[in-house]
Structures are given as C-alpha cells and as structure tokens.
Amino acid sequence: MKQKRRKRISLYILVFIAGLTLCSSVNILPVTNTHAGYSIFLSNYPFPSFQSISYSPEFNLNSDSVVIPLKRAGRLFLIEAKIDGQIGNLVFDTGANGLVLNSTYFRNYTKTGGTISTGITGNIGPVEQIAVRKIEFSGILYKNLKADLVNLGHIENHRGVKILGLIGFSMMRNLEIIIDPKNSELKLIRIDKRGERVNNTDSEFKTDFTQKIEGNTNILFIRGKIAGKNLNFCFDTAAETNAISSDSNKSILSTLTIMRRSILKGAGTARSEVLFGRMNDFKIGENEIREMETIITNLDALSDVYGTKTDGMLGYNFLQQGTFCINFVKKQFGIRFSKKEEI
C-alpha cells in the first residue's frame, strides 16, 4: 500500500494541461517548429491515495433517487456541497479514486499519514489524510469519511470559484449513476445487491451501446479502438480534454491531426513537450466519434498508479457525445448518444 501511495500522480496535471492549452492566449505554432513560445505551468496537486474505499449515502425524504445539478466552471463540472458546515463546490472528478479536500479550508483538522507524491516531472509534495463528519448535497448525506488533504488553490485561482475538494465514483459506486452533461445533471438511483433499482417508478435508461466494466476499483476504464487497435481509456469527468499515450503504436498516432505544441512545466525544474490535436479514428463498439480534442503525452505514471495499462483518457469532449449510465454492481457502462445537431 505504501508503495502504491508513493506512486501517486496528478490527474490535474493532465486536466490543467488541457485547460491552459485551450486558453485564447496560446500561440498556435506549426508542428515543425522545435521551440514552443508558450509554457504550460502545472499545479502541485498530488493524486489521491489508491484505495478501494466506497461510501453509501443516506437519502433524505425517503427518496430512492436524486437529481444533482452540475454547475460549470469552464470545462469542469461542480457540485454545490456542505462539508462539516463549510459551503462550497466539489469538482466531479471520476479520475480521482478517493475523496480529496482542499487544505485551504480543512487545515485545522487532525492529520494522519504523509507520503511523497509523484507527478509527471518528479516528486511534488506530501499528502496527509483527515476525517470529516459529514458531507451534504442535493438531499443526500454521507457520514464519517476519510479524505486526502491537498492544496487545491490552483483550481480556485484558475476558475475563480470556491473549491472544497474533488468527488468521484467512490461516493456513488453502490448506486446507479446517470451523467447528463447536456442538461448539466447527475442522477443517483438506489439499487439492491444485484444492481436492480429498488423502486421501478423511474423509467429504465435506454442505451445505444453497452460495455462490461472490468476490474473492481473506483476508476472506470472503457475499451475503445483507434486504427483498429483495442485501447484502454480512463473515463475522467474532470479531464478538460482527452489524452493519448505518446507510447502508442505509430499506426494509432498517425490517425491524429496535430495542431500545435506546448512546453509542459511541472512543479520541479523538468520540462517536456506536449502535442495538442484531434482524434480522427476513435470508435467505441461500432460507433465512430471523430474530431475530439486530445493531448499526446506520456501516461506511464498513470498506468503505474492505476495498476493497469492506460492508453488514454476520455474527458470533456467525450462527455459531450451523449448521456452515460454506470452500474458498478451489474458491471455495466452504457451510452445514449446525442443527435449530431445536439452536440
């Protein structure tokens, strides 16, 4: 466990590569240029501990489902929440394995643990753990949770909103999850031990495509294809763009349209080059999705911390393709695609 905790990596390194790359101040450079005139500066955000803890909420008013409004901050989805009386926003981040809270607001809590976190460009700082009494949002309540405590000030500064922390599938994997980006809604539905809805009054979610979920962690991986080759993608609602591993087969990389390059600068002194472009040959099942934005970068550290080979990440552009239903108990992932005019 300690070794896995030392292999933490920042998903927000990838998230904010995308966000900053997309800023209007970026100079579009020809790919043949060997020196980019724009540097991407990364945060000190460490990846949360790789633990398999999950929590089940209490539903108020004896309800069997809840619809949670998702606010937008750029390409991030936010949930308004109250944590031990503190009101603010949680980033909906399915790439985070556990609950992560902002040290700005929870620094006075009793801390345990303390390991060195690793980012793409090297060690970037320690992570401590705290316990919180309760988290409330949209009529549901969680009690007695553990959370990693890190500095998330860079997200607040970048987006101009109060960020209490990050929340992912660990808080909802015992429920049926419906993510509707178009209508900015997250719906959670009570299910039994077999994954069936406890109340059938809600209409069943109809999918255009269904895929079996592999593994048993709080991180969701989706199988897709590029250039006819099967690839393993992390489904990440907080990734502001997609990502493809720079170690991918040449036949895969050749399908990408490279638009520009930027310099990736981490918390340390090391730098690396990141390419930004579009995916032209992505398929999930027999469904082709073209021209999604992506970055091309090394994902070896991400594979290490997840314990599985990670060929890419599917983020904001993928989420715009439809409505998603996830049932970890049944091990089912489904998509109902939006009509082309709706995307």
List each model region and its residues.
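Pepsin/retropepsin-fold aspartyl endopeptidases
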Residues: 2-343
